[in-house]
From Swiss-Prot:
Signal peptide: none annotated. Belongs to the MRX11 family. Residues 1-45 form a transit peptide. It is found in: Mitochondrion; Mitochondrion inner membrane. Residues 106-124 are mitochondrial intermembrane. This is MIOREX complex component 11. It comes from Schizosaccharomyces pombe (strain 972 / ATCC 24843) (Fission yeast). It is a multi-pass membrane protein. The gene is mrx11. Keywords: Membrane, Mitochondrion, Mitochondrion inner membrane, Transit peptide, Transmembrane, Transmembrane helix. Associates with the mitochondrial ribosome. Component of MIOREX complexes, large expressome-like assemblies of ribosomes with factors involved in all the steps of post-transcriptional gene expression.
């Protein structure tokens, strides 16, 4: 049997590992070499980076392309990908979705209506919304439907613009 090889950045180096039992070779284990972890298999050692929830192989084409584009930030993402994704989702909820009902409540309670809107579009939208509410079983007056629709649209516009 040939000794296992190790690949780092496309270079192949030979590494002699003491003999192991077949059970250990099948399970696979990690060895420490120059402060890096390598996954042992009988034929090839591949460098892997482990986080608490996920393992990303560092020899994939996508990973190499990402390293060229982002550099230092990609290494930080590589160590803890799920924490970065969770932080993005949390900040998105905090900055985009949470202000929507707050602005809607402010516009609805202050009875504010934006000026300069074409009346024919508001009337057409109010009739469509009133027919949808009627199909759902809500019999609301047309004026209340148009006010609610206008407050929702204004809140959405403020959140998206700001």
């Amino acid at each position: 049997m040939l000794p296992p090889t190790i690949r780092i950045s496309g270079l192949a180096k030979t590494l002699h590992i003491p003999s192991r039992s077949p059970l250990q070779a099948l399970k696979g284990s990690f060895i420490l070499l120059n402060k890096r972890k390598f996954h042992y298999s009988p034929f090839i050692l591949q460098e892997k980076v482990q986080s608490s929830n996920h393992t990303i192989r560092s020899d994939t084409k996508l990973w190499k392309r990402l390293l060229k584009i982002t550099g230092k930030q990609a290494h930080q993402f590589k160590d803890k990908p799920f924490s970065h994704i969770f932080a993005f989702l949390f900040l998105h909820e905090l900055s985009a979705i949470l202000p929507l009902p707050i602005f809607f409540f402010i516009f609805h309670s202050l009875d504010w209506t934006p000026t300069g809107l074409p009346g024919e579009y508001l009337q057409k939208g109010s009739h469509v919304a009133a027919s949808i509410f009627a199909k759902l079983g809500y019999n609301l007056p047309l004026e209340k439907v148009s006010k609610t629709l206008l407050d929702g649209a204004a809140a959405y516009a403020v959140v998206k613009v700001c």
